[in-house]
């Protein structure tokens, strides 16, 4: 019992620290791509502390409730991943958290929040089927939905699931709202959206959504690590290279509209998934 409590504490604090560092590294890489110096690595933590120091102001109580539910869902999903629980359960919990964030935005009458929320729903509809297909592929290869069993597999999954890893990269780009799929909100506010999904979040409540996002980043990178679980070096290299390409694509891509997003993600994602699943079945 004490060991489990310690693991939960390490998962929450470590996830917060790692998520903030990844966010800081994202900013530094983005600055380098744009020939800028960029902020220090710890800047996301300074921003988070500044948000916590602000006055707590919400549009309505439901908005704050949804923000708490969002960060609770993402933290629970991360803890379950660290405890090596069931992968399907983790995907379901993170999806519930994403829906709560949308519901919180819909509770506002701001047109920017409304548009951002509807676009976020479309993004959820685009990446969730892909995550499920990737999970099915992992199960067909390992015969296990348990993360403990997947990590104990005797060869890197990417060797047998290369197309599904590409599909996971697509889902990762949409999930993290990176260009060209930053339709609902982004770190760089768009003219017609302002801040979109997060327009009416501010102060400590906005800080909660940022913490939830950090947990999501760590969770989805943990998902990527399943594809090279045979040794730590390969796992770290795979995750690092994957996130580097996510940042690179974010900086060289123009934003698509939702029709292009659904067309590209579903057409390419479902096609690659089908090819890889047939390969597994035949092989």
Provide a role label for each language-model segment:
Residues 1-283:
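Alpha-helical transmembrane segments of multi-pass membrane proteins predominantly involved
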